[in-house]
Regions:
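Generic helix N-cap/helix-start motif at coil->alpha-helix transitions
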Residues: 26-34, 66-68, 170, 174-177
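Extended amphipathic alpha-helical interaction segments
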Residues: 116-237
């Protein structure tokens, strides 16, 4: 019995030594740790938390910074659009619901504030990418999020003036963010409005041409800048910042007819905003 106990003890010691000598987990607070946390939050459907981790990674220059910047351009752009679109749905409900419009108004304010935060993260990431990353091909170093490319059916409730139940509010928000992040990914890899094509691309390592990536980013910047228009948050300075970054991104890529047309469209919107 003593021999058996000794053998068991030796076996356990060898096992523990082998575990201890294996690959160690990243230290908390390091870029590798933050990257893993971003991936975990992303796959759990917590897009805003994933975005926060990506912002934290970019506080220093490290090996994860370029990947985090590319990911944030796609992620934060989708988050901003998701919050903004959902806010518009509640704004519609506020106009239609004459029983408790204030409840809808609170959601509008909260969602547009969250959209504004994500929009600024998105804008900053695009600015840094244009200035620091000359790559001709952009590697999308992340996989697809959970959720669906289809617009959530539950969105019809706030649009129509019916307040979602308490348990449905967060579920709708999560579904909406996932939906718009997927849309942002489609746009970034040149498969806009074609989720089937996007799914096939993500079966292997995904790279997209710089032109496609930055044209998509510029289009997203311009679309989301409407959040700061007079009939929404009425913040002309942020509108100007976003639209100018969109123009700068477009001017850094080959001047195709599409790029020139979008630049003209953005500059016309800037002139209209300045004239108010």
């Amino acid at each position: 019995m003593k021999i058996q106990a000794l053998l068991l003890a030796v076996t356990a010691a060898v096992f523990l030594a082998a575990c201890a000598s294996g690959p160690s987990l990243p230290e908390p607070g390091t870029p590798a740790f933050l990257w893993n946390e971003a991936r975990h939050a992303y796959h759990s459907g917590d897009m805003p938390k994933a975005n926060d981790y990506l912002s934290e990674i970019q506080q220093t220059d490290n090996s994860f910074t370029p990947r985090a910047r590319i990911w944030q351009i796609v992620l934060a752009g989708g988050i901003a659009r998701g919050y903004s679109d959902l806010a518009d749905a509640y704004a519609s409900g506020e106009r239609l619901n004459h029983t408790d419009p204030l409840a809808f108004h609170r959601h509008v304010n909260e969602l547009r504030a969250s959209a504004s935060h994500a929009a600024m993260d998105f804008t900053q990431a695009v600015h840094a990418f244009v200035a620091r990353d000359p790559s001709t091909d952009v590697q999308l170093g992340f996989d697809l999020p959970p959720g669906s490319a289809l617009e959530p059916v539950a969105l019809r409730k706030p649009y129509g003036g019916t307040m979602p139940l308490e348990g449905e509010v967060l579920a709708l928000q999560t579904a909406m963010l996932e939906h718009d992040v997927i849309g942002s990914i489609c746009l970034a890899n040149g498969s806009a409005n074609d989720s089937a094509q996007m799914l096939s691309k993500f079966k292997a390592e995904v790279t997209t041409p710089r032109f496609t990536f930055l044209y998509a980013a510029a289009k997203n910047l311009f679309d989301i800048s409407g959040l700061f228009a007079l009939n929404r948050l009425d913040q002309p300075q942020k509108f100007q910042v976003m639209t100018q970054e969109a123009v700068s991104a477009l001017q850094s890529i080959p001047q195709t007819d599409d790029a020139k047309s979008l630049i003209k469209k953005i500059q016309a919107a800037q002139k209209r905003a300045a004239a108010r």
